[in-house]
Regions:
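Intrinsically disordered, low-complexity regulatory segments enriched in Ser/Thr/Pro
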Residues: 59-120
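Membrane-inserting effector segments that mediate pore formation, membrane fusion
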Residues: 1-3
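Charge-rich, solvent-exposed alpha-helical interaction surfaces
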Residues: 22, 26-29, 33, 90-94, ...
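N-terminal topogenic membrane-targeting module
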Residues: 5-65
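Surface-exposed polar/charged interaction patches
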Residues: 32-36, 40, 98-101, 105, ...
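Low-complexity, intrinsically disordered regions enriched in charged/polar residues
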Residues: 17-20, 24-28, 85, 119, ...
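Glycine-rich, aromatic-bearing surface loops/beta-hairpins
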Residues: 113-136
Length: 136
């Protein structure tokens, strides 16, 4: 890490880590997402799905869910459910709070399609994001 660099160097995610298999399950949709956004990605894997923080959480970011080979952004899901901008903003604040509460979670990096992606195998963060998504 350079003197002026804000990028954190996380250890590489080993193939023996269960999170590596979880990321592999969503690798193709993750690659598809990478062609649509140029922002950094942080994957929070779980069994059968993953959440992706897009951008630079906890400041400026978006959230997407990868499940059954599909990527759906939080904003798109919220609009489908008819939520207004005020409610969406409140839920975004909850995502920020959940992320900040889990800042100490172990993070790793993995190479996907030639790009470095951060992986955060944190069950607590998955549970909190699930609660927020289910509250829509």
């Amino acid at each position: 890490m350079g003197f002026f660099s804000k990028k954190v160097n996380y250890p590489e995610l080993g193939a023996d880590n269960p999170a590596a298999g979880q990321v592999q399950e969503v690798e193709q949709p993750l690659k598809d997402l990478m062609t649509q956004v140029s922002d950094p990605l942080e994957v929070i894997p779980s069994d059968g799905y993953a959440y992706v923080f897009i951008g630079k959480p906890p400041k400026k970011f978006g959230v997407a869910k990868i499940e059954e080979g599909q990527v759906q952004s939080f904003v798109a899901a919220a609009r489908e459910k008819g939520l207004d901008q005020v409610k969406i903003q409140k839920l975004n604040e909850k995502f920020r709070d959940a992320y900040e509460q889990n800042m100490d979670a172990q993070r790793y990096t993995i190479n996907v399609a030639g790009k470095e992606v951060v992986v955060t195998p944190c069950k607590e963060l998955v549970q909190e994001v699930n609660q927020i998504m289910n509250s829509m």
